[in-house]
Regions:
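Recognition helix of helix-turn-helix/homeodomain-like DNA-binding domains
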Residues: 27-43
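Helix-turn-helix DNA-binding elements, focusing on the entry/boundary residues of the two helices
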Residues: 8, 19, 48
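Short alpha-helical "recognition helix" segments of helix-turn-helix
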Residues: 21-23
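Short, charged recognition helix plus adjacent turn
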Residues: 61-78
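A short, Lys/Arg-rich alpha-helix, primarily the initiator
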Residues: 1-15, 25, 52
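DNA major-groove recognition helix of helix-turn-helix/homeodomain DNA-binding modules
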Residues: 45-65
């Protein structure tokens, strides 16, 4: 799950969503988002769904991209 923060940062930048906006919709402090996107902490597995749900409210395409990228990064390399 170490790549979740990298993926979140990419999605936020691609879709023009601020860390503050995501934090507000999630009902958490912006510092949590900051730690995730700067790889200082990994979001808990339950937070992945909360991130998806918040992104869905802000921009459904961003939510789809986040989950698709996260699932793709979870597949073992062959």
């Amino acid at each position: 799950m170490a790549k979740a923060g990298i993926i979140l940062k990419q999605v936020l930048e691609t879709y023009g969503i601020s860390q503050s906006d995501l934090a507000k919709v999630m009902g958490i402090q912006r510092g949590n988002i900051h730690r995730w996107v700067n790889e200082l902490a990994d979001p808990a597995s339950t937070a992945i769904i909360e991130i998806r749900d918040a992104l869905q409210k802000i921009n459904p395409a961003a939510a789809r991209a986040f989950i698709e990228l996260w699932l793709d990064s979870s597949e073992p390399e062959t």
